[in-house]
UniProtKB/Swiss-Prot annotation:
Glycan attachment points: 36, 127, 264, 272, 325, 368
Parts of the chain that traverse the membrane: 410-430, 444-464, 487-507, 528-548, 578-598, 630-650, 652-672
Entry protein name: Relaxin receptor 1
Biological source species: Homo sapiens (Human)
Residue ranges of every copy of the LDL-receptor class A domain listed in the record: 26-63
Underlying gene: RXFP1
Residue spans, topological domain Extracellular: 1-409, 465-486, 549-577, 651
């Protein structure tokens, strides 16, 4: 063996081993190699816009160029590159067409008469090869209007007002390859109208008013490759072979029509068809053999129709299919073996479809699948062998984390801690406070308990976020369908509804006692306890009803990772949507309106009673303090509920709401009331401040006595709360004299300003 031969073999084997070192890297299921290095990354780190491999390999080949785009590049681009239609165009830019209309432009053998208000086809010399008559006023094409243009190859008639075309209108156009009739008013094409167009390859008739077509319509189109009938009003396709006179047809686009069903005979002669687009029609039924003749089909687009059921073997003959779009159909169930025959499938779109029976078995046979699109990113866990799975997030969660944003992951703990601490602090203080108004104290404790549940809800969400950190996608679907998620979601609704009802109850109490001090009805202890119990029972009923009937409410709380049913899902039943609207735009909106109206009336009433006061300056100061307190109470309610009302209202109008909105609302906006209620209703009130001062004074006195070695008996830690009256003569300070706020308000209406100062 010569040295040259040895060098040749070394070179060949060197390249082989070098290549194999990267391509033969074996990664476990759900992981994919980083090009030519021995490193594997999980599915969620591929095609995420970040160079996680270090050599950009995880971001290479992320574009989905399968289906029509690949077919276009493969056939049309290469074909027209090889067959240049205008070899003289660059060499002869001057006009070579004789008798050109004054308003038209000419270059070489191309004529441009766009937007020249032409009402008929102009008469020019017969050597023209391209004629553009767009944006004119042409209403009809009479017989033989193009008969002299034997060399015409491109004809543009878009955006005219064409309503009728004579059967002989295109007679003589033996060289025509592209015909554009888009954006006109054509309602019918007579059979044989294209009879002389034997070389026509592109026929574009989109955005017209065609209501029916038949095989004879396309008689003579032996060379047709592309037929576009988008956005017409076709209601059905013929039950005869559609491609009978179009044997070379590769691309058929019927998007945006009103087609209801597809017949078995329609595509029986379309054996060369590679792209079939049927999206945005009204197809509700498919026969098992509908696509059987289309054995060369590369892309099938059935998105945005009304298909509810897929026959089990409907795709069995589509062995060459590389792209399938079934998105946004109300498909009830997908068979486990639905895609078994699509061995070459590379792109699968299932967006907008709730796959209740999803399982890995559905996608396991699709070994060439590189792109898959779901309604929920949680479904990506059922296709771990697919490199690119979308969506990566729902705005709330991501493939890695239950809470996608680092800000949310931090603040869920901060907000929950503040909420729980504030409310527990107030609850724990109550046993040490001797209050003359026990009923009000009871209501405040009840409110704190409800608000504390919101903090517990956020703690649980934060805890599960920690538990699933870095691998949430593996657990996402099970988590949202779990009992834990259902209970956590119901806990949030329980907290929300009880808090809303209690705030309304407390507000109405204040309203009656201040606005109608001499007519207020005293409910008494028994009635107050009954009201509080009824509020909690109502909250429990509202929160747990969705758990009682799964068939009616479906997965009511499990529509997102935070288990909060803020906005409607497409898959929700009508009853569940009505129920959700009744809560947020019924109970809560009514309560918010009552609170705003009541506080406005209270302030107005106090302001009116202060007009006759002698100490005007003092009254103005007290009114300002009162106004500030009322403002902050109403403002926090508005800050919490107005965004929620807006989101719910928009979802009712079917406006698409980003998932990020839901997560920010749940973590930052919804807990506002729960976190601030202890501050507004307890910690900033005058009795609390006086109690703190008294406690501090007693503490300093005791410390002073102890330092002098004297024994002292300091008064016990007491907070005497007089709500809404907080300044009373000593002779009226008797436990049995005033037991309810309304009675105290009878003494003097002018002293009401002290209630909130």
């Amino acid at each position: 063996m010569t040295s040259g031969s040895v060098f040749f073999y070394i070179l060949i084997f060197g390249k082989y081993f070098s290549h194999g070192g990267g391509q033969d890297v074996k990664c476990s299921l759900g992981y994919f190699p980083c090009g030519n290095i021995t490193k594997c990354l999980p599915q969620l780190l591929h095609c995420n816009g970040v160079d996680d491999c270090g050599n950009q390999a995880d971001e290479d080949n992320c574009g989905d160029n399968n289906g029509w785009s690949l077919q276009f590049d493969k056939y049309f681009a290469s074909y027209y590159k090889m067959t240049s239609q205008y070899p003289f165009e660059a060499e002869t830019p001057e006009c070579l067409v004789g008798s050109v209309p004054v308003q038209c432009l000419c270059q070489g053998l191309e004529l441009d008469c766009d937007e020249t208000n032409l009402r008929a086809v102009p008469s020019v010399s017969s050597n023209v090869t391209a004629m553009s008559l767009q944006w004119n006023l042409i209403r009809k094409l009479p017989p033989d209007c193009f008969k002299n243009y034997h060399d015409l190859q491109k004809l543009y008639l878009q955006n005219n007002k064409i309503t009728s075309i004579s059967i002989y209108a295109f007679r003589g156009l033996n060289s025509l390859t592209k015909l554009y009739l888009s954006h006109n008013r054509i309602t019918f094409l007579k059979p044989g109208v294209f009879e002389d167009l034997h070389r026509l390859e592109w026929l574009i008739i989109e955005d017209n008013h065609l209501s029916r077509i038949s095989p004879p319509t396309f008689y003579g189109l032996n060379s047709l490759i592309l037929l576009v009938l988008m956005n017409n009003v076709l209601t059905r396709l013929p039950d005869k072979p559609l491609c009978q006179h179009m044997p070379r047809l590769h691309w058929l686009d019927l998007e945006g029509n009103h087609i209801h069903n597809l017949r078995n005979l329609t595509f029986i002669s379309c054996s060369n068809l590679t792209v079939l687009v049927m999206r945005k029609n009204k197809i509700n039924h498919l026969n098992e053999n509908t696509f059987a003749p289309l054995q060369k089909l590369d892309e099938l687009d059935l998105g945005s129709n009304k298909i509810e059921n897929l026959p089990p073997l409907i795709f069995k003959d589509l062995k060459e299919l590389s792209q399938l779009n079934l998105s946004y159909n109300p498909i009830q169930k997908i068979q486990a073996n639905q895609f078994d025959y699509l061995v070459k499938l590379k792109s699968l779109s299932l967006e907008g479809i709730e796959i209740s029976n999803i399982q890995q078995r559905m996608f396991r046979p699709l070994m060439n699948l590189s792109h898959i699109y779901f309604k929920k990113f949680q479904y990506c866990g059922y296709a771990p062998h697919v490199r690119s799975c979308k969506p990566n997030t729902d705005g709330i969660s991501s493939l890695e984390n239950l809470l996608a944003s680092i800000i949310q992951r931090v603040f869920v703990w901060v907000v929950s801690a503040v909420t729980c601490f504030g409310n527990i602090f107030v609850i724990c203080m109550r046993p040490y406070i001797r209050s003359e108004n026990k009923l009000y104290a009871m209501s405040i404790i009840s409110l704190c308990c409800a608000d504390c549940l919101m903090g517990i809800y956020l703690f649980v969400i934060g805890g599960f976020d920690l538990k699933f950190r870095g691998e949430y996608n593996k657990h996402a679907q099970l988590w949202m369908e779990s009992t834990h998620c259902q209970l956590v979601g119901s806990l949030a609704i329980l907290s929300t509804e009880v808090s809303v009802l209690l705030l309304t109850f407390l507000t109405l109490e204040k309203y009656i006692c201040i606005v109608y001090p001499f007519r207020c009805v005293r409910p008494g202890k028994c009635r107050t306890i009954t009201v509080l119990i009824l509020i909690w029972i109502t909250g429990f009923i509202v929160a747990f009803i969705p758990l009682s009937n799964k068939e009616f409410f479906k997965n009511y709380y499990g529509t997102n990772g935070v288990c909060f049913p803020l906005h409607s899902e497409d898959t929700e039943s009508i009853g569940a949507q009505i129920y959700s609207v009744a809560i947020f735009l019924g109970i809560n909106l009514a309560a918010f309106i009552i609170i705003v109206f009541s506080y406005g009336s209270m302030f107005y009433s106090v302001h009116q009673s202060a007009i006759t006061a002698t100490e005007i300056r003092n009254q103005v100061k007290k009114e300002m303090i009162l106004a500030k307190r009322f403002f902050f109470i109403v403002f926090t309610d508005a800050l919490c509920w107005i965004p929620i009302f807006v989101v719910k209202f928009l979802s009712l109008l079917q406006v698409e709401i980003p998932g990020t909105i839901t997560s920010w609302v749940v973590i930052f906006i919804l807990p506002i009331n729960s976190a601030l209620n202890p501050i507004l209703y307890t910690l900033t009130t005058r009795p609390f401040k006086e109690m703190i001062h008294r406690f501090w004074y007693n503490y300093r006195q005791r410390k002073s006595m102890d330092s002098k070695g004297q024994k002292t008996y300091a008064p016990s830690f007491i907070w005497v709360e007089m709500w809404p009256l907080q300044e009373m003569p000593p002779e009226l300070m008797k436990p049995d004299l005033f037991t309810y706020p309304c009675e105290m308000s009878l003494i003097s209406q002018s002293t009401r300003l002290n209630s909130y100062s």
